[in-house]
């Protein structure tokens, strides 16, 4: 049996045991829509489309756990391989990165963006050779009392990041990531969701920031990884290296509207300087009322204890859904075949 067939069978047999978190669906830049790799469909297609996003064994929309932060899985997700094409953008452009499905309300945490120069075609680059520098990293905002992941949800499940205007032209990989901290108070409880996309950046800049290997970005016990997000006023240190000179933690967030779609640019194609679309619109994100139930996936759970007998809360929480925790007002009774289990004082889950 082929490796792909074996993986397919494993994924199908485990379908009932997993629940979606998310992946990047597409990006919008200068009004142009570029499709990302879809791990929930493209993996199963004999001839998937050529896209800008890196493929990964993320069929469950799952995560990379802290115990694997020293492995190549943290670079661009599990067993990631380069996308077959790229999107051409200008240095200084703003890129809207759109996730699917809706990011869970419970999965609070930072949103972090990196770039790495491929020094050649990104479509064939060795991911271990990439050196990442941070161009954005937003955590907890004490003024709004929101996490960056909250802001992403409120912004239509999208995040706006800006390419440095003085960046040297070349082929780069954009590494965009959410780190969910709902289980972060326990060892190996944080969840990293790295997503990688190939960019061909054009411009006249000469800035070539130094970077670090992907396997050196984080450690399992870093202050921003092993962290309790449920304290009254979190003083949260965004993990990873410092922002490059001139970068900010995040730019003002707005939603972007695509006016046309484009296919990934294949290696060796002529460089065409992109121009802004004539009717691209952006708007401040409306406040999105979060749902009262969530679905989560756990690939490995920290030591747990049985939850107290469920009380209050209407309805039934699905397997892998939240069923308790300080302040929780949703369902506390689990679906048949699962038990409400305490992961920490703030989060209990049907396991």
UniProtKB/Swiss-Prot annotation:
Molecular function terms from GO: cellulose binding; metal ion binding; monooxygenase activity
Q: Which residues form the CBM1 domain?
A: 315-351
Keywords on this record?
A: Carbohydrate metabolism, Cellulose degradation, Copper, Disulfide bond, Metal-binding, Monooxygenase, Oxidoreductase, Polysaccharide degradation, Secreted, Signal
Q: What is its EC number?
A: 1.14.99.56
Against SMART domains, the record matches this protein to: fCBD
**Which residues, if any, are the signal sequence?**
1-20
Gene Ontology CC terms, in alphabetical order? extracellular region
The note on cofactor binding and number reads: Binds 1 copper ion per subunit.
Residues noted as binding Cu(2+) in the record, renumbered to the chain: 21, 107, 193
- Tell me the protein family, please: Belongs to the polysaccharide monooxygenase AA9 family.
Protein name as catalogued: AA9 family lytic polysaccharide monooxygenase A
The organism of origin for this protein: Podospora anserina (strain S / ATCC MYA-4624 / DSM 980 / FGSC 10383) (Pleurage anserina)
């Amino acid at each position: 049996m082929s490796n792909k067939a074996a993986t397919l069978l494993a994924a199908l047999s485990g379908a009932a045991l997993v629940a979606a978190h998310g992946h990047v669906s597409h990006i919008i830049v200068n009004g142009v829509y570029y499709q990302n790799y879809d791990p929930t469909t493209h993996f199963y297609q004999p001839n998937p489309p050529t896209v800008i996003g890196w493929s990964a064994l993320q069929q469950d929309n799952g995560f990379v756990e802290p115990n694997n932060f020293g492995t190549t899985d943290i670079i661009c997700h599990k067993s990631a391989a380069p996308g077959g094409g790229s999107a051409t953008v200008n240095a200084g452009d703003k890129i809207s990165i759109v996730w699917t499905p809706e990011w869970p309300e419970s999965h609070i945490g930072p949103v972090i963006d990196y770039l790495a120069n491929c020094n050649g075609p990104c479509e064939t680059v060795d991911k271990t050779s990439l050196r990442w520098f941070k161009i954005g990293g937003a955590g907890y905002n004490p003024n709004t009392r929101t996490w960056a992941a909250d802001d992403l949800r409120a912004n239509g499940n999208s995040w706006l990041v800006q390419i440095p205007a003085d960046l040297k032209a070349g082929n780069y990989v954009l590494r965009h990531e959410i780190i969910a901290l709902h289980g972060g108070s326990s060892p190996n409880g944080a969840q990293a969701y790295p997503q990688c996309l190939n960019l061909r950046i054009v411009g006249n800049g000469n800035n070539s920031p130094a970077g670090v290997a992907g396997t050196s970005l984080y450690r399992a016990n870093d202050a921003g990884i092993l962290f309790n997000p449920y304290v009254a006023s979190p003083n949260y240190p965004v993990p990873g290296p410092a922002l490059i000179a001139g970068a900010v933690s995040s730019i003002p967030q707005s939603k972007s509207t695509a006016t046309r779609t484009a296919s990934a640019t294949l290696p060796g194609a002529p460089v065409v300087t992109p121009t802004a679309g004539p009717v691209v619109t952006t708007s401040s994100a409306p406040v999105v009322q979060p749902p009262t139930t969530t679905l989560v996936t756990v690939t490995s759970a920290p030591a747990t204890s049985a939850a107290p007998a469920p009380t209050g809360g209407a309805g039934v929480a699905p397997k892998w859904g939240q069923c308790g925790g300080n302040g929780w007002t949703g369902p506390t009774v689990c679906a048949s075949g699962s038990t409400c289990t305490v992961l920490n004082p703030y989060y209990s889950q049907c396991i």
